[in-house]
């Protein structure tokens, strides 16, 4: 199964941002790894944990964790 949009990211400071599609993720996060950014929590529209990896504006992984 694939994650369902919108994707929500809760950052270490408590701020939550929502992304409507893959392009929105790429253009607004640019460089992000949910495995190494341990203070962040990434969830899909159904509240499921998501593994998200972006490197230099390239979406490397978007899957259920």
Q: Which residues are covered by each model-predicted region?
A:
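Short, extreme N-terminal segment that most often corresponds to the first beta-strand
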Residues: 1-19
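Short, flexible N-terminal segments of the mature chain
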Residues: 15-41
